[in-house]
Amino acid sequence: MKNILIKDKSDLDGVEEFIPNAYILGAMEKPNLPSEDIKVLSTKFSKVGRTTLERFPNLEWVVYRGHGTDSINLDMCSQHGVGVVSTNPNIEGCSHWIKDKLKDGETIIFGNGSISKRLQQLITDYHVVDSKTKIIHIDDEYKNVVSCVSLNQSTEDMFNYELFKNMNDVNFVSISRAKTHNNKDLVKLIEENKLSSIFIDTLGTDVRDELLNTNKVTYTKHMSWDYLGHKNDHKKLSEIIQSCLDDNVENPILSRRKNQWF
């Protein structure tokens, strides 16, 4: 019996060799399979919330092939007793991509997840702000501002005029979702020379043109993921999925418990 569903197959070339007993679907493909059999669901882009959890009533684990959890409704998963674990892919590529975009001088890093922690090992002269810490504005002592935060209610529009207003000639580097940036404010900050350069690596394209028209913004689509040429680790994914089936998951984002239905 197949009890594994892997969605968003764009990063999955050759995964069948490592996980032969799985259903594998693209992001837009509808699952035509016995949904009650699925115990482990792995996603990269697809959202996991009420619809998914009700479609797969016996789901036990979600294995997220990304960073952060903004596409996973953790509250809903918790209510349904479904555990969540991340493969934390592309840490090396993302952290080195950020490092190579930094200018001389002190750096402030927003977010303290796996990519941020690896970046901290690669650089000196930095200060870290946990995403739970609310900062209204940054003092003019840093030359680089780095965003590694996930998108949630508290980080939406986080990088705005108020945050940067006391700074001058600053380099901003972000791998966060597009909605964490207030693009109109970023344009204003560039016009006032508070920001001298911006590097954003994300799939979002919201009002991207007005940023690019400043000629001071480099906007790429997840180039950092493959920055060092590392391929996706199918063996690691296979091992994590097996640990879910064995109910022996290390360092889950959310622990599994017996399903709690409404």
Segment roles from a protein language model:
Residues 1-38, 126, 135-137, 260-262:
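N-terminal glycine-/charge-rich "phosphate-binding" loop or analogous flexible N-terminal tail
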Residues 6, 41-43, 64, 146-147, ...:
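Redox-cofactor binding/interface segments in oxidoreductases and associated redox assembly factors
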Residues 14-15, 86-97, 197, 204-262:
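C-terminal helix-to-coil terminal segments
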Residues 24, 83-85, 126-128, 219:
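Hydrophobic beta-strand scaffold residues
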Residues 38-40, 61, 143-144, 171, ...:
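Short, Asp-centered acidic motifs that coordinate Mg2+ and/or phosphate
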Residues 39-101:
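Phosphate/diphosphate ligand-binding glycine-rich loop within oxidoreductases
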Residues 49-52, 132-211:
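Rossmann-like adenosine-cofactor binding region
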Residues 95-124:
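Glycine-rich adenosine-cofactor-binding loop
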